[in-house]
Design a protein with these regions (language model features):
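P-loop NTPase switch/coupling surface
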Residues: 1-95, 287, 292, 312-335
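Extended helical coiled-coil dimerization/tether regions that scaffold
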Residues: 3, 79-169, 174-191
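Soluble or luminal CAZymes and related metallo-dependent hydrolases
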Residues: 32-36, 118-125, 168, 209, ...
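RecA-like P-loop NTPase motor core
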Residues: 45, 215, 219-221, 234-335
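Non-catalytic, well-ordered alpha-helical scaffold segments
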Residues: 52-55, 81, 124, 167-170, ...
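Short, polar/flexible loop-turn hinges at active-site or ligand-entry regions and domain interfaces
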Residues: 65, 70-72, 111-112, 274-277
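Short coil/turn segments at secondary-structure boundaries
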Residues: 70, 142-144, 280-284
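Switch/communication elements of ASCE P-loop NTPase nucleotide-binding domains
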Residues: 143, 147-276
Length: 335
């Protein structure tokens, strides 16, 4: 591990207690890591450190099922809270984000009675991050009835009215900004360093959002490194090949020669090795082209009519119809 130009060697080994296959040569070596962790903690406690690194993992179970507005809980404002459950399986605890936001907004509203322009930097970091990634604004808690709302395209909505993809991304971004705000003493809380792992970044997202979600994450949290998994051609088509690792059967496959700028169908065929078109339709198109190449134009016309009745005027059908009309004068006579 390398942190602030310092190399650290460490390892964690887990042997079954009194296990038959316990390996005495395998043991944890955490001395260097523990020493560095203590140094970071001391620097933070003494006010010498302005930022601590975030490490957090969001798995595929991060879907937000409910917004627990009526839960009352006092949360600590410390680095310990920022790291709580950050690497646990089962998804980040988004409940804590909503509770944290409501508690801080209560404090902000108290100060605004005397100073209407007062804003909590921690909440501003969340609002800025959400606006940057989703375009939503004015995230707030309404009291009567109790609900969390935001502005989408100028319309105030309850967050429960958002799609699953919108709500999941909102909570993920809010949780990241919350954690970073507790680990940074700089004015711009979103500028903190970190390593963020997100499984299936395209989870529930509309294909249009999949296209730019990675770029928006990098712009919103510029000092964070993102390690993402995806099965989305839209996501892969927005990344340079050096940023892509292809896994198959638990093995690292050869790096792709190109990804950025490819269409979704090209990504499916070249990177994912899958068909970009329905197999039956692809076979019908091949049969039509084969008849045209053989000069069997009557048969080609029958294939064309059958295919059109099945799929309509898709671009490939129109292209082959135009070619057939040029090759077979009989089509123009019939027209």
């Amino acid at each position: 591990t390398r942190w602030r130009d310092q190399d650290m060697d460490w390892a964690i080994a887990v042997n079954r207690k009194q296990g038959v296959y316990a390996d005495p040569e395998r043991k944890s070596e955490l001395t260097a890591l523990n020493q560095h962790a203590r140094a970071l903690t001391e620097a933070w406690n003494e006010g010498l450190s302005k930022a601590l690194p975030l490490t957090v993992y969001y798995d595929v179970n991060r879907a937000v099922l409910d917004v627990p507005m009526r839960v009352r809980e006092k949360l600590a404002d410390s680095p310990d809270e920022a790291y709580l459950d950050a690497l646990d399986p089962g998804g980040a605890d988004f409940k804590r984000f909503f509770i944290w936001f409501r508690n801080l907004e209560d404090q902000e509203n108290e100060f605004r009675r005397d100073d209407p322009l007062h804003r909590k930097p921690e909440l501003e970091a969340v609002r800025e991050a959400i606006a940057s990634l989703t375009g939503f604004s004015e995230l707030r808690v309404r009291r009567n009835p109790l609900r969390m709302t935001l502005s989408k395209a100028g319309q105030e909505l309850n967050v429960q009215q958002l799609s699953d993809g919108e709500r999941t991304l909102l909570a993920l971004v809010g949780d990241m900004a919350r954690r970073l705000s507790m680990l940074n003493r700089v004015p711009s809380k979103r500028q903190g360093p970190g390593v963020v792992l997100i499984d299936e970044i395209d989870l529930h997202l509309h294909p249009r959002w999949q296209r730019d979600v990675v770029a928006k994450l990098e712009n919103t949290f510029p000092q964070c490194q993102f390690i993402l998994s995806t099965h989305s051609p839209q996501v892969l088509g927005e990344l340079p090949p050096e940023a892509v690792k292809v896994l198959g059967d638990g093995q690292l496959r050869p790096a792709p020669g190109r990804t950025l700028g490819l269409s979704s169908s090209e990504v499916l065929e070249e990177i994912m090795e899958g068909p970009s078109r329905n197999t039956a339709v692809a076979q019908a198109l091949h049969t039509l082209e084969h008849a045209m190449e053989d000069g069997d134009y009557p048969q080609a016309r029958r294939h064309l009519a059958a295919l059109r009745s099945q799929v309509g005027d898709i671009p490939e059908v129109l292209r082959l119809e135009e070619q057939l009309a040029w090759l077979d004068p009989a089509m123009e006579d019939e027209a």
